A protein has these predicted regions:
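Aromatic-anchored segments of alpha-helical transmembrane domains
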Residues: 24-31, 171-185, 237-251, 309-310, ...
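Juxtamembrane "helix-exit" motif on the non-cytosolic side of transmembrane helices
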Residues: 34-40, 110, 114, 181-193, ...
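Alpha-helical transmembrane segments of multi-pass integral membrane proteins
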Residues: 243, 247-362
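Functionally critical transmembrane alpha-helices in membrane proteins and complexes, commonly lining
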Residues: 13-73, 93-101
Length: 375
């Protein structure tokens, strides 16, 4: 297979677009939760339920994008170095995660999920389990994929360009994942272990299908790219049908609306997320084919800071919400409040991600120059 059909693909890839779309969409979710919990009318709750399901693709898209880009860059380099992989992601992912988790636990302790820490032991547990803030469960899950990257690299080496092996891997992955969803639905989602097994939602197996499919999408990019660009209309149909399906399921739980009843761990949401991923990928390929260089550069730039912006978004969300008295506005204009708070949060999150990265880069250079240590 050709490495690139278009030279413009070297500027930004499908993974970049998925990260930016996912990061942008996910920033709306905590804001919707806050506004929806303010005893809104049923009509408003219906609207928020539809919007929530619309953007409920973010974690799968991010995982797919991370695996796609990592396997792509390693494949083009001709090898995968686990040490260099961890070294790079220690600075890009682990360090920001540590700092932001500390900020949430110490600076905004009211954001903790489930239980609040009351000792050093419970502090450490909240630190690692993703309960320090509403969105940090994803960090706990995503970092598992970073650690397990050699496993997914081995899958890419196993299938290589063998379509039969790829098909077998895809089928086995789908069967295992659907079995996992059935298990989760029976035992955890409103099941007997809803309260004591809830952390299963952030174990890597709950999202591994998107990682495997991200690997296969790169390894068989000629087939994947041709399919999503040629049959984008069919993917749109699947997207609409799955979107209707997810909204129907959520409506069956009645009102007041609870976003807990719209989890990722359902067949409807799985196929919906895969459809959204394919549509975003098709959009990326369209811009690549049209050589829309400026757009590609913008997406690549934003993708670099997407994870850091994600970490910061709830922090800025809280400051915007409290500082601008958004609670008052949400009573009368819930949707305008959502979009206004969303926009401000997005701007502040990406701006702070960029500025903090620039500052941290300078600090590292100073430390390295004085101590000869790598951070």
């Amino acid at each position: 297979m050709k490495k690139y059909k278009y030279s413009s693909y070297e500027i930004a890839d499908i993974g970049d677009y998925l990260k930016v779309f996912a990061c942008t969409a996910v920033m709306s979710q905590p804001i919707m939760s806050i506004i929806n919990n303010m005893h809104q009318s049923q009509q408003t709750q219906v609207g928020f339920g539809i919007l929530y399901n619309l953007v409920k693709y973010t974690a799968p898209a991010f995982i797919f994008g991370i695996l796609y880009t990592t396997i792509r860059t390693s494949d083009l380099n001709g090898h995968f170095s686990y040490f260099k992989h961890l070294q790079k992601n220690w600075s890009n992912l682990f360090v920001p995660t540590i700092w932001w988790t500390l900020i949430y636990l110490l600076g905004m302790p009211w954001l903790q999920q489930e239980n609040k820490f009351n000792s050093f032991g419970t502090f450490c547990w909240q630190f690692i389990n993703g309960n320090a803030a509403p969105h940090l469960w994803y960090n706990t899950m995503m970092l598992q994929f970073i650690i397990l990257m050699p496993f997914f690299w081995s899958i890419s080496r196993y299938v290589r360009n063998n379509i039969k092996r790829a098909f077998a891997v895809a089928i086995v992955t789908l069967i295992l994942y659907l079995a996992w969803l059935a298990f989760y639905d029976y035992y955890v989602f409103h099941g007997v272990h809803q309260n004591d097994w809830y952390l299963l939602d952030r174990v890597f197996i709950s999202f591994f299908i998107y990682a495997v499919f991200g690997v296969l999408a790169w390894q068989f990019r000629s087939y994947f790219n041709e399919f999503i660009t040629k049959f984008w209309w069919l993917i749109v149909v699947i997207f609409i049908l799955c979107f209707i399906w997810t909204n129907y399921e959520l409506s069956q739980f009645g009102y007041p609306l609870n976003f807990y009843n719209a989890p990722y761990y359902k067949p409807s949401m799985t196929f919906y997320c895969l459809a959204v991923i394919c549509l975003i990928a098709a959009f990326c390929l369209y811009q690549v084919c049209k050589r829309q260089i400026n757009s590609l550069r913008i997406f690549h730039f934003l993708a670099i800071y997407a994870y850091r912006a994600y970490l910061a978004n709830v922090f800025w969300n809280q400051l915007v919400w409290r500082g601008l008295n958004m609670q008052y506005h949400a009573k009368f204009h819930p949707f305008l409040t959502l979009f206004g708070c969303w926009l401000l949060t997005w701007i502040l999150s990406f701006s702070s991600a960029y500025l903090l990265h620039m500052w941290w880069t300078k600090v590292k250079k100073m430390i390295a120059r004085n101590t000869h240590l790598y951070i």
